[in-house]
Curated annotation (Swiss-Prot):
Function comment: Could act as a modulator of glutaredoxin biological activity. May play a role in cytoskeleton organization.
Modification comment: May be glycosylated.
GO biological process, one term: cytoskeleton organization
Recorded superkingdom: Eukaryota
Localization per Swiss-Prot or TrEMBL: Cytoplasm, Cytosol; Cell projection, Ruffle membrane; Nucleus
Cited InterPro entries: Glut_rich_SH3-bd, SH3BGR, Thioredoxin-like_sf
Family recorded in the similarity comment: Belongs to the SH3BGR family.
Gene Ontology terms: cellular component: cytosol; nuclear body; ruffle membrane
Species for this entry: Mus musculus
Name this protein carries in UniProt: SH3 domain-binding glutamic acid-rich-like protein 3
Amino acid sequence: MSGLRVYSTSVTGSREIKSQQSEVTRILDGKRIQYQLVDISQDNALRDEMRTLAGNPKATPPQIVNGNHYCGDYELFVEAVEQDTLQEFLKLA
């Protein structure tokens, strides 16, 4: 797969995960950055792919990937936004 992907889930009981996913997509949309939303709840293989790319067998959404390069999780995303290094974080610069 190529391009920017945000791994998320449409099925979660966690308000925290829902909130984090919404914030990531809101910021990307606001900056007009194109991405593909990958719903891991639809296929266990997608969840496994997300965890493999993240290098963490317990990784939870949202996780951000560009091509086959892992960018980071929600905390790293927010840090990049706050430090105005989002383009570098997303491997777009």
